[in-house]
């Protein structure tokens, strides 16, 4: 099972403070484990514009039609000082990895320098920190009914209002997440 380019949807019974009602976009899943970013937990009072100012990046030429007041997301509990940018394909960045035909992840500063300019990727999501699972750990959590999985959807990732992403991801499975029992079992 390879869950790269899938969403993990936290089951209602998952009460962990970081992952409660989370949608995690899985960027990588292989024999070493899995790595992903929470896409529905914005950081309080922290926008892309704040990040650019903190890093002394002045978008030039500035395109006023591109909003920089978009939130930065808490990607997960690990390395919360490291930035990750999910974006639609746009070549030329120093450290980009293609996740799917619709999505890339970049960790180099050069992508930040394009934000707010005409050369930025069409869609972006900026996160600090990431989520990771050791080999077999995610599979164990799936067996324990902690998560639902569904192939990722570019519209949910980049366009669905943040407060609706958890429910929208579950709806891809035909499920109203609010109607799921918190009791788990196996047939």
UniProtKB/Swiss-Prot annotation:
InterPro entries: AlgH-like. GO terms for cellular component: cytosol. SUPFAM superfamilies: VC0467-like. Transmembrane segments: none annotated. Belongs to the UPF0301 (AlgH) family. PANTHER family: UNCHARACTERIZED PROTEIN YQGE, UPF0301 PROTEIN YQGE. This is UPF0301 protein PC1_3712.
């Amino acid at each position: 099972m390879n869950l790269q380019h899938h969403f993990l949807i936290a089951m209602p019974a998952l009460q962990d403070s970081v992952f409660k009602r989370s949608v995690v976009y899985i960027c990588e899943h292989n024999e070493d484990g899995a790595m992903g970013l929470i896409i529905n937990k914005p950081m309080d009072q922290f926008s892309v514009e704040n990040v650019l100012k903190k890093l002394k990046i002045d978008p030039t030429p500035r395109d006023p039609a591109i909003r920089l007041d978009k939130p930065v997301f808490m990607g997960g509990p690990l390395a919360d000082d490291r930035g990750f940018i999910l974006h639609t394909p746009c070549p030329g960045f120093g450290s980009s990895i293609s996740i799917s035909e619709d999505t890339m992840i970049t960790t180099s500063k050069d992508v930040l320098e394009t934000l707010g300019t005409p050369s930025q990727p069409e869609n972006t999501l900026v996160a600090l920190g990431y989520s990771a699972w050791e080999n077999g750990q995610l599979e164990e959590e799936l067996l324990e009914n902690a998560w639902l999985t569904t192939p990722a959807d570019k519209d949910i990732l980049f366009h669905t209002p943040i407060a609706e992403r958890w429910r929208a991801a579950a709806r891809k499975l035909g499920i109203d997440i609010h109607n799921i029992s918190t009791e788990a079992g196996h047939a």
